[in-house]
Amino acid sequence: MDPCECSKTGSCNCGGSCKCSNCACTSCKKASCCDCCPSGCSKCASGCVCKGKTCDTSCCQ
């Protein structure tokens, strides 16, 4: 089960004090703490592929 609700709500709490918005970590030291992508986007190793963009973190907004 994916603990991240980002794909449904746009935000999630990834455990402890770590919170994410739009699959980007906002309150911990990691660049990303959710292995999820926005609705309609594909997941890949380094981020999300949205709107035909290449696979990198800038795709997941």
From Swiss-Prot:
Pfam family, one: Metallothio
Binding site for a divalent metal cation 3: 14, 18, 23, 28
Alpha as annotated region, ranges: 29-61
Record-listed a divalent metal cation 6 binding positions: 37, 41, 44, 60
Residues noted as binding a divalent metal cation 2 in the record, renumbered to the chain: 6, 12, 14, 25
Region (Beta): 1-28
Keywords: Metal-binding, Metal-thiolate cluster
Binding positions (a divalent metal cation 5): 34, 36-37, 50
Annotated binding of a divalent metal cation 1, by residue: 4, 6, 20, 23
One GO term (biological process): response to mercury ion
Keyword Metal-binding set for record: yes
One GO MF term attached to the UniProt entry: zinc ion binding
Residues reported in the UniProt entry to bind a divalent metal cation 7: 50, 55, 59-60
Protein family: Belongs to the metallothionein superfamily. Type 1 family.
Note on domains (UniProt): Class I metallothioneins contain 2 metal-binding domains: four divalent ions are chelated within cluster A of the alpha domain and are coordinated via cysteinyl thiolate bridges to 11 cysteine ligands. Cluster B, the corresponding region within the beta domain, can ligate three divalent ions to 9 cysteines.
Function noted in UniProt: Metallothioneins have a high content of cysteine residues that bind various heavy metals.
Stated name of the protein: Metallothionein A
